[in-house]
Amino acid sequence: MEAELALEKRQERGVALLAALAKLRESVAAANVDVMVVVSNAHRIWPDDSQAVFGVMRSEAFAVTVPNNEPFDPDARFRDPGTRAKPQTTDKAGHPDLANHLISGLIERGFDVACKDGLREGEAIDEAFGFVYDLLPEGSTTPVVPFMLSRYLPYQASAARCVALGKALREAIESWDSSLRVGLMASGGLSHQVIDEELDARVVAGLTSGDLADLAELPREQLNGAPGTPEILNWVTVAAAMAPTNMTLVDYVPAFRSLAGTGHGLTYGTWG
């Protein structure tokens, strides 16, 4: 493990990650989508007393956090929230027509979907959905429909349910009476904040081979081995939606950051 934490190894991973991001940007630009549906996890934007397993943001626009270019402060999370620097935000376009169609289409297909019409004062969607803007061409005004999938227990869908969801999501998108070109993206995952390379390898194998049966059997206990690992379900959902097209792996980088094995199984891939 010490070798994984060496400066040279970290720099090597950094170079690999930048190269993977460049390839993703090329793929997104080539796809030339008119609207993007992003499957990810809502962080801190559902009311504390109301949490949904599945949800769709259907507002005309929503606030998204953006980098403030301030030096990284590792102690910020331990301070009183009132004394922390406020993240910068910018408004991004949604697509209510597609969002409403997805809600009704999924309900028709057996999925009860919550809808979110906007954010409370001071709230903003974070990098879970904001990452897509790093991939879209600079200056793009492509609208985004956030599809929110809970990663939290006990209101967390099973892997099998997410496979069924992905299939229904595809049908709903295909039934939309529009000439607009719809893109679909999974954001988040794979294993983190403790890396599980065995699980990640199984997931990547399922994504690249199109083995939805195996992805549907991913153990709930293993998926919850670390707080962020359930975000794998985002990928399972999109893989099912994209079937029979399999994912092409761009890169998998286990980015370790401590001797305890903490870190992030960073994964990049494309469908199409």
Language model features with spans:
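Flexible, D/E/H-enriched segments
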Residues: 1-33, 51-167, 175, 195-272
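Beta-strand elements within well-structured catalytic alpha/beta cores of enzymes
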Residues: 34-41, 147, 180-188
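Short, glycine/charge-rich beta-strand/loop segments that flank catalytic centers
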Residues: 38-46, 118-123
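Short, solvent-exposed loop/turn segments at secondary-structure junctions
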Residues: 43-45, 152, 191-192
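A contiguous pocket-lining binding segment that forms or flanks enzyme active sites
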Residues: 168-174, 182-196
